[in-house]
C-alpha cells in the first residue's frame, strides 16, 4: 500500500525535525484557539447540550460537534453511526425516527443526557456570543444533510448570514462543497482530514475554505511544516485533533497550529499558555510518541479506506 506521505524512517527523523522547529520557534502573535472536541467530553457525556454548556463555561473558544441524519430527516448531534456506544441502544441512526423514538434515549454516562438535535444546539449557541460551532460532517452522510442543516438554521434565525460568524461546516470530502455552495453560500468551510495531499488538492486553495483540521499524528512528519506554512501563506488556519496528552499539544504548538481540539479544554488552555514549547521532545514520555506513531499508521489506513470507498 503506497501513500503520498509516508512516516519518517525512524523516530529520530521526526525528533530531529521537532527539535529544529523548537529551536527556531517564534513567539505566538496570539494564543491558539481552544476547541472543545464533542463539547467537554473529558467530564461530561459527549455531544450533549450539557457538554456544550460546560465547554463554554470552561472557556473554550469553539465547540466541535458531529451531525447525523435520521430516517425522518432530523439532523441530530451524534458521532457514531450507531447509538450503542453512547446511548446503549443498538440502532443505526439512519433507522431512527427521531420524533417517535428519541424520548427513549439517554446517555449511558451520567447524568444521562438526551440525544440533542442540531436545532437545539443552535438555540444554545445563540446564548453564547463569541463562541463558534464547528460542525463535523462525516463523509458517509447523505448530501441531503446540508439542506436539512440549513433548514434548521433558518428556523432558529431566518437570516442565514446571521450564522456566518457563529457556525462553520467542516468537511472530510470535497463532494460536499457543491451542496454547501448551493444551500449555505455564506457559511465558512473547513476541511477535516488525515492526508496533506488530499487537503492541498481539494481544500487549501479553495476560496471558500477558511482552514484545515488535521490529525495531530501527521505533524510528526518532517515535511508537515511545509504544509502548515503553505496553509498560512494562503491566510488560512491550521487546527490539530485530538490533543489529549502534553506531547500532542506540544507537537501542535511547535508546528504553529492555530487551533487545538481537545476533549479537555481546561487542560489544553493551561498547557498552551505554559512553558511547554520550551521543552525538548524527549521531555515527554516515550509512550505518548509511540501512541502518536500508531495514530499516524491508523490514520493512513483509514484514509486509504475512505479514498477507496467514500471520498
UniProtKB/Swiss-Prot annotation:
What does the record give as the reaction this protein catalyses? a 1,2-diacyl-sn-glycero-3-phospho-(1'-sn-glycerol) + H2O = sn-glycerol 3-phosphate + a 1,2-diacyl-sn-glycerol + H(+)
Where does the UniProt annotation locate this protein? Answer: Mitochondrion membrane; Lipid droplet
Per UniProt, the enzyme's principal EC class comes to hydrolase
Pfam families named among the record's database cross-references: GDPD
Query: For this protein, what is the EC number?
Result: 3.1.4.-
Q: Name one GO biological process term.
A: glycerophospholipid catabolic process
The protein's superkingdom reads Eukaryota
Indicate the principal place this protein occupies in or around the cell.
mitochondrion
What InterPro entries does the record tag this protein with? GP_PDE_dom, PLC-like_Pdiesterase_TIM-brl
Membrane topology value: Single-pass type IV membrane protein
Q: Which GO terms describe its molecular function?
A: phosphatidylglycerol phospholipase C activity
Bilayer-crossing regions: 289-310
GP-PDE domain: residues covered: 32-272
In terms of CDD domains, this protein maps to: GDPD_YPL206cp_fungi
- What GO cellular-component annotations does this UniProt entry give? endoplasmic reticulum; lipid droplet; mitochondrial membrane; mitochondrion
Q: Which UniProt keywords are given for this protein, alphabetically ordered? A: Hydrolase, Lipid droplet, Lipid metabolism, Membrane, Mitochondrion, Transmembrane, Transmembrane helix
Give the family this protein belongs to, as stated in its UniProt record. Belongs to the glycerophosphoryl diester phosphodiesterase family.
Q: What role is this protein assigned?
A: Phosphatidylglycerol phospholipase required for the removal of excess phosphatidylglycerol (PG) via a phospholipase C-type degradation mechanism.
Protein name per Swiss-Prot or TrEMBL: Phosphatidylglycerol phospholipase C
Question: Per the UniProt entry, what species is this protein from, by scientific name?
Answer: Schizosaccharomyces pombe (strain 972 / ATCC 24843) (Fission yeast)
Q: Organism classification, top ranks? A: Eukaryota, Fungi, Dikarya, Ascomycota, Taphrinomycotina
Amino acid at each position: 500500500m503506497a501513500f503520498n506521505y509516508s512516516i519518517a524512517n525512524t523516530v529520530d527523523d521526526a525528533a530531529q525535525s521537532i527539535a529544529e522547529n523548537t529551536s527556531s520557534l517564534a513567539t505566538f502573535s496570539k494564543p491558539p484557539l481552544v476547541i472543545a472536541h464533542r463539547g467537554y467530553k473529558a467530564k461530561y457525556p459527549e455531544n450533549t447540550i450539557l457538554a456544550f454548556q460546560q465547554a463554554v463555561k470552561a472557556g473554550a473558544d469553539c465547540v466541535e460537534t458531529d451531525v447525523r441524519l435520521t430516517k425522518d430527516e432530523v439532523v441530530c448531534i451524534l458521532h457514531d453511526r450507531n447509538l450503542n456506544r453512547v446511548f446503549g441502544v443498538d440502532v443505526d441512526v439512519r433507522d431512527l425516527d427521531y420524533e417517535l423514538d428519541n424520548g427513549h434515549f439517554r446517555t449511558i454516562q451520567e447524568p444521562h443526557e438526551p440525544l440533542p438535535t442540531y436545532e437545539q444546539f443552535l438555540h444554545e449557541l445563540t446564548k453564547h456570543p463569541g463562541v463558534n460551532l464547528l460542525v463535523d460532517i462525516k463523509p458517509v452522510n447523505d448530501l441531503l444533510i446540508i439542506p436539512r442543516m440549513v433548514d434548521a438554521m433558518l428556523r432558529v434565525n431566518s437570516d442565514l448570514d446571521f450564522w456566518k460568524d457563529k457556525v462553520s461546516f467542516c468537511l472530510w470530502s470535497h463532494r460536499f462543497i457543491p451542496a454547501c455552495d448551493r444551500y449555505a453560500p455564506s457559511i465558512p468551510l473547513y476541511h477535516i482530514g488525515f492526508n496533506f495531499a488530499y487537503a492541498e488538492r481539494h481544500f487549501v486553495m479553495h476560496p471558500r475554505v477558511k482552514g484545515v483540521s488535521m490529525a495531530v499524528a501527521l505533524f510528526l512528519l518532517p515535511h508537515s511544516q511545509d504544509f502548515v506554512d503553505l496553509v498560512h501563506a494562503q491566510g488560512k488556519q491550521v487546527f490539530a485533533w485530538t490533543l489529549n496528552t502534553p506531547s500532542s499539544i506540544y507537537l501542535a504548538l511547535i508546528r504553529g497550529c492555530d487551533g487545538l481540539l481537545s476533549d479537555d479544554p481546561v487542560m489544553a488552555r493551561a498547557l498552551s499558555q505554559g512553558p511547554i514549547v520550551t521543552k525538548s521532545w524527549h521531555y515527554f514520555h516515550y509512550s505518548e510518541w509511540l501512541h502518536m506513531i500508531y495514530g499516524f499508521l491508523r490514520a493512513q489506513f483509514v484514509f486509504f479506506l475512505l479514498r477507496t470507498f467514500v471520498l
